[in-house]
Regions:
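Short beta-strand/loop motif that positions the catalytic acidic residue
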Residues: 177, 183-185, 189
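Catalytic histidine-centered segment of alpha/beta-hydrolase-like enzymes
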Residues: 215-228
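Conserved HGGG/HGGXW glycine-rich cap/lid loop of the alpha/beta-hydrolase fold
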Residues: 2-54, 68
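Acidic beta-to-alpha connecting loop that harbors the catalytic carboxylate
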Residues: 16-17, 187-189, 214-216
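Gly/Ala-rich beta-loop-alpha elbow adjacent to hydrolase catalytic centers
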Residues: 67-71, 75
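Flexible "cap/lid" loop of the alpha/beta hydrolase fold
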Residues: 48, 80-81, 85-124, 129
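Catalytic histidine neighborhood in serine/cysteine hydrolases
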Residues: 194, 198-217
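Conserved alpha/beta-hydrolase catalytic His-Asp/Glu region
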Residues: 99-102, 117-176
Length: 240
């Protein structure tokens, strides 16, 4: 193995609820030349911890952990479980809080709807919260979001929602996470609003905060170039 290959960064990308690797299509294209990219398996596991532990079992050495939404919970858990292995932490369109009881009930209602044979109706119902108003007018973008949800399917949707409901509040862990970190959020994100990103950034010791104008929850798809640039900057900091 050449010295260059031996020193290549590893980049772990964790998708969000109802999302596949296509969530990071543009970032994979932009960054694959400088990092070995691994996509977290979020299917069929009933806890965020199980998703994170599988990553630690399957990947050797140090890596930069990036997650969007539910994937952010996985990235945070990786940093908490194995801080010595996480060279950089990227938290996109996510938060460090546990679900409130009201949010858990909303998730239970969506699970119930999906089990009544109405799974195809779940994602269109969520679209106004996943994309900005401008993003909702982009037919190609909407088609990609719907295709990801169909690929995930009802059973995995249920297990992912259960994992999200069971996650821990990680805000108390943030001040101990000393690795270079990035917190990024769209200013039009109603699922994980910018205030939550600002709180996380204020608690992380070595954090860059980026808020993107006119962007909703699925920031990596709505603002691919800006997100790729932010991740490239995080890789630079992690490699320094």
């Amino acid at each position: 193995m050449s010295e260059d290959n031996k020193n290549r960064l590893q980049l772990v990308l964790a998708p969000g609820l109802l999302c596949t690797a296509d969530l990071f299509r543009d970032q994979i294209a932009a960054l694959s030349g400088r990092a070995d990219i691994h996509i977290v398996d979020t299917m069929g596991m009933g806890s965020v911890q199980a998703m994170a532990e599988k990553v630690l079992q399957e990947i050797d050495g140090r890596f930069v952990a990036i997650g969007l939404s539910m994937g952010g919970y996985v990235a945070l858990t990786l940093a908490q479980l194995a801080p010595q292995r996480v060279a950089g932490l990227g938290l996109l369109s996510t938060n460090a809080e546990a679900d409130t009881e009201a949010k858990k009930q909303q998730r239970r209602d969506l699970i119930a709807l999906s089990k009544m044979g109405k799974f195809k109706g779940v994602t269109p119902r969520l679209l106004p919260r996943l994309l900005s108003l401008q993003g909702q007018q982009d037919d190609q973008l909407v088609a990609r979001v719907l295709a990801m949800a169909e690929a995930v399917g009802q059973a995995n949707f249920t297990s992912q929602q259960e994992a999200i409901m069971g996650r821990a509040d990680r805000r108390g862990d943030l001040p101990q996470l000393a690795m270079p970190s990035l917190v990024l959020c769209g200013r039009e994100d109603s699922l994980t609003p910018p205030e939550q990103s600002q709180e996380m950034a204020g608690l992380l010791p070595d954090c860059e905060l980026r808020l993107l104008d006119g962007v909703g929850h699925l920031s990596s798809m709505e603002a691919p170039e800006a997100v790729s640039a932010a991740l490239a900057a995080l890789l630079d900091r992690a490699a320094a």
